Amino acid sequence: MIPSSPFLCFITDESRSPIILARKALEGGASMIQLRHKSADGDQLYHWSVAIQALCRKHKAIFIVNDRVDIALAAGADGVHLGQQDLPADAARKLLGKDRIMGISVSSPLEALAAEKNGADYVGFGHIFPTSSKDKKNTPVGPESIADIKAIITIPIIAIGGITGCNAQLPIRAGAAGIAVIAAVSRAADPEIAARELVGILQKNIEHNR
C-alpha cells in the first residue's frame, strides 16, 4: 500500500552507506525508502535490502528496490521501482504477483498511461526541477506538468528531480501524492534533520489546504 499523501520517499545515494542513510531518513519521518545502487553486485544488494527492509518494518515504512525484481523478491521487499529501460512492467508484475508494489519512472503523459495500463501502482514523474542526478540535457518538466499527468491516470504520482525544502510544496500543490529526494537528504549535514524538515513542509501543505 502506498503511504498516505503527502509523503516523503528517500532514494539512497551511492556515495554513502545506504543502510545509514535509510535509517536517518526513517528517523526523520520518511514513509518510503528506495534502494538504488547501480554499481553494487547482487550479493551486496541483497544484504542491504534485508537490512533496510527490517528498518522499514520497524518504522512502518515502505521499502522499494530499484530495478532488481529478483532482489526485491529474495529480500522480501514491499516492491520494486522500474525505469523505462528495465524489465517490462507486465513481465515484472507476473513475477511480483498482485500484492507487491510496482512503481515506474515516467517523463510524459504517454509513459504514465502505459505504466498504469501495465499494472503500476504509482509513477515516479520528473525530473521536476534541474538536478545533478539526471541528464542535464533534458529540460525539467516543471511542477505545473503534474496536473496534466494527474488528469489522465488514477494511480499516485511521486514527483522527483531537484526537490528541496525551498520547492517541496509545489509538486504536492500541483497534485503529486509524494516527493522523492536523494541529495536533499543524503548530502545534508544531518540527513535525519533534513528529512524531518521536508516532512514538516509537507505537513504544512496539509494545513494550507484545510
From Swiss-Prot:
One cellular component term from this protein's GO annotations in UniProt:
cytoplasm
Note whether Magnesium occurs among the keywords: yes
PANTHER family (alphabetical): THIAMINE BIOSYNTHETIC BIFUNCTIONAL ENZYME, THIAMINE-PHOSPHATE PYROPHOSPHORYLASE
Keyword field contains Cytoplasm: no
Cofactors needed by this protein, per the record, are: Mg(2+)
| The protein's role, per its UniProt record | Condenses 4-methyl-5-(beta-hydroxyethyl)thiazole monophosphate (THZ-P) and 2-methyl-4-amino-5-hydroxymethyl pyrimidine pyrophosphate (HMP-PP) to form thiamine monophosphate (TMP).
Family statement drawn from the similarity comment of this UniProt entry = Belongs to the thiamine-phosphate synthase family.
Question: Quick one: which residues bind 2-[(2R,5Z)-2-carboxy-4-methylthiazol-5(2H)-ylidene]ethyl phosphate?
Answer: 131-133, 162
Per UniProt, the keywords (alphabetical) are: Magnesium, Metal-binding, Thiamine biosynthesis, Transferase
Q: Which reaction does it catalyse?
A: 2-[(2R,5Z)-2-carboxy-4-methylthiazol-5(2H)-ylidene]ethyl phosphate + 4-amino-2-methyl-5-(diphosphooxymethyl)pyrimidine + 2 H(+) = thiamine phosphate + CO2 + diphosphate; 2-(2-carboxy-4-methylthiazol-5-yl)ethyl phosphate + 4-amino-2-methyl-5-(diphosphooxymethyl)pyrimidine + 2 H(+) = thiamine phosphate + CO2 + diphosphate; 4-methyl-5-(2-phosphooxyethyl)-thiazole + 4-amino-2-methyl-5-(diphosphooxymethyl)pyrimidine + H(+) = thiamine phosphate + diphosphate
Q: Biological process GO terms, please? A: thiamine biosynthetic process; thiamine diphosphate biosynthetic process
Name this polypeptide is given: Thiamine-phosphate synthase
Q: What is its EC number?
A: 2.5.1.3
